[in-house]
Amino acid sequence: MSFVKFEKQGNVAVLTIDRPEALNALNSQVLCDLDAAISQVEADDEVRVVVLTGAGRSFVAGADIGEMVNFSAIDGKKFGVHGGSIFLRLENLSKPVIAAINGFALGGGCELAMACDIRIASEKAKFGQPEVGLGITPGFGGTQRLPRIVGISKAMELILTAKVIGAAEAKEIGLVSQVYAPEELMDKALELANAICANAPIAVSESKRCIRMGMQTDIATGSAFEAEAFGVCFGTEDQTEGMSAFLEKRAEKHFQNK
């Protein structure tokens, strides 16, 4: 039995963290199942966009405290490296990932959402990095991604106070881009995913890569990445199709991921 469900809807893969009795808390097995799902998505040429969500009333309530409570320092580091490396794989996936945050996104759950490319949330969603209240630091990238997304001052406030915020404040600080009624969330996530799918897959993938790489370097180096990606696209059949459709005033496009 896998704790991460994989479902395809056209060119969209929907991954659901499915451990609702534990509010989808991340233990070692859930992390391994997520890693396997990422590999499945990467290998499937039909998948162009991923939507990640949680079963029940939680996105991911955090790492599993029941598993962590008796960790040694060595165990803790190994668990952090394990989760952190999987989240980095998700972040570096060639296909865009949309987090549809349906409920609690705390600790490791907030970190998982931040590893996604686009975050949208239910009005009932809750966000936070409450680890210092448990005597630990964020362990799956929270100290690195949160300040990059919301700025250093706000990240310090959220992490050092262990404050939990609602969806409206998460949107206000830029942690999520949109907030929807709970019953609308998945429809809106799929609508967004399909809007991305309508574009040239190689161009979408290269654009994601440039943004991600650019966030880690200076503008000059990032611009060099962009120029390389720009050139790569001119060697694709999809560039020919896209520009031909524009010149021919043709609304329908047939992108082949080539």
Where are the predicted features?
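Glycine- (often His-adjacent) and acidic-residue-rich active-site loop
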Residues: 3-5, 32, 46, 54-89, ...
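Crotonase-fold acyl-CoA enzyme core
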Residues: 91-202, 235-236, 241-244
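Helix-loop "lid/cap" segments that line or gate small-molecule binding pockets
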Residues: 158-159, 210, 214, 229-234
